[in-house]
């Protein structure tokens, strides 16, 4: 009887181990960016913050799959601790929080748009507005990026939205916004016209309450 009981317990243990193994293998692998040949830089993400009331705020970035900040304004240190007024001005000086980071290249390239170099500005003005960006947010993007996207005749543009970005670069606030818009563009230049891409559905963003917007670019 004792032998049967011991056998049953051993069998139960083995079954539990077999069940547990697949779940353990689903844990994300954290990559050391200093030894990562496939990591890539996210250039110039700008974070705009619009509180309903003046607020003292801590903002933190995290890299669940591995990664690190390589530059920031104001200095990131162990996290931004900033004062933001109702106009979005940060520490009475900055219009946005700026950083650049390196992390694993797992960005999507299944859907997006192909655009001529000559039409880039009009494309981004409309596309960013469709996603929910406004005014200075769009102007800042245009002023910085259009002069830097002049080397190719055509550009493939792949949007990366909040769900995917959050998987790679987490953005946390001591007081969470009511609404958060995060959009990165993966941009790849070509000298020949490429096949048309599957265009994504663009969700409507509500600029209501206390909200935050962020854009950035990954060049390929």
Question: Predicted regions span which residues?
Answer:
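C-terminal motif of bacterial Sec signal peptides marking the signal peptidase cleavage site
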Residues: 22-25
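Bacterial N-terminal signal peptides that target proteins for export
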Residues: 2-12
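Protease-labile, long low-complexity intrinsically disordered regions enriched in Pro/Ser/Thr
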Residues: 27-220
């Amino acid at each position: 009887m004792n032998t049967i009981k011991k056998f049953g317990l051993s069998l139960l243990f083995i079954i539990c181990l077999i069940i547990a193994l697949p779940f353990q293998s689903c844990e994300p692998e954290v990559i050391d960016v200093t030894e990562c040949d496939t990591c890539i830089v996210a250039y110039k993400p700008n974070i705009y913050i619009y509180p309903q009331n003046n607020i003292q705020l801590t903002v933190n970035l995290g890299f669940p799959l591995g990664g690190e900040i390589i530059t920031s304004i104001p200095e990131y240190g162990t996290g931004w601790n900033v004062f933001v007024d109702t106009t979005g001005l940060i520490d009475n000086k900055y219009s946005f929080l700026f950083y650049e980071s390196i992390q694993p290249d797992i960005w999507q390239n299944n859907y997006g748009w192909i655009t001529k170099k000559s039409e880039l500005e009009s494309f981004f003005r409309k596309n960013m507005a469709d996603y929910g960006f406004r005014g200075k947010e769009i102007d800042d993007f245009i002023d910085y990026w259009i002069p830097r996207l002049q080397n190719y005749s055509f550009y493939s543009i792949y949007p990366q939205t909040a769900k995917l970005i959050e998987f790679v670069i987490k953005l946390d606030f001591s007081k969470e916004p009511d609404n958060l818009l995060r959009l990165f563009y993966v941009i790849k230049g070509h000298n020949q016209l490429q096949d048309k891409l599957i265009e994504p559905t663009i969700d409507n963003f509500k600029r209501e309450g206390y909200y935050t917007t962020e854009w950035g670019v990954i060049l390929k």
